[in-house]
């Protein structure tokens, strides 16, 4: 059945794509994907949906860049009276998810990178959280030159970079829409985009 999906002579059936066509239960035919998490537990792009998305990608060997900047800061109360726990608390869930999937049964080589904009209210907590609390994810700070100029946390950020706990990434736009970095910080994609 999957062979019928790729009958065109110009479609290269090599590597991951060929392996996936032969065994759709195996690794995904993509290496990397991006998910921008909305500030809601529910919904197609909410926090719970991101857990399912990340779980699926990691299970099949893809890397996932999870962008958390839309999540309200720790302690913020919304119009329903619900108090946010902030992006760092959810980062711990992604870390545990990656550890469990990577170790559960067969080793998979998917990576998980968390992203947070430098101007997010919880950026200091994000930068200074010990590696022991987020051991199975990498952390990336997304910024513009103006954000760098304005931040009071240059020292903490540089210490995080020096220790290998923090990566930096430029914020980019395409056709007036923000695009988001993938795991290796080389390709920018829309949410749920793949490379």
What would you call each of these model-derived segments?
Residues 1-195:
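Extended catalytic cores of very large enzyme megasubunits
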């Amino acid at each position: 059945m999957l062979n019928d999906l790729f009958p065109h002579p110009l479609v290269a059936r090599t590597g991951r794509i060929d392996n996936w066509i032969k065994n759709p239960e195996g690794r995904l035919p993509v290496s990397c994907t991006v998910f921008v998490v909305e500030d809601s537990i529910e919904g197609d792009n909410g926090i719970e949906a991101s857990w399912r998305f990340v779980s699926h990608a990691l299970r099949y060997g893809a890397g996932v860049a999870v962008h958390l900047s839309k999540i309200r800061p720790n302690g913020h109360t919304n119009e329903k009276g619900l108090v946010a726990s902030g992006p760092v608390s959810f980062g711990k869930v992604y870390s545990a998810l990656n550890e469990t999937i990577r170790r559960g049964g067969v080793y998979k080589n998917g990576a998980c990178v968390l992203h947070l904009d430098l101007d997010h209210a919880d950026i200091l907590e994000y930068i200074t959280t010990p590696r022991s609390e987020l051991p199975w994810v990498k952390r990336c700070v997304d910024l513009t030159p103006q954000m760098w100029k304005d931040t009071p946390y240059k020292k903490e950020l540089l210490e995080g970079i020096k220790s290998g706990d923090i990566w930096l990434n430029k914020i980019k736009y395409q056709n007036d829409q923000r695009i988001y970095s993938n795991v290796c910080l080389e390709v920018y994609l829309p949410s749920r985009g793949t490379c």
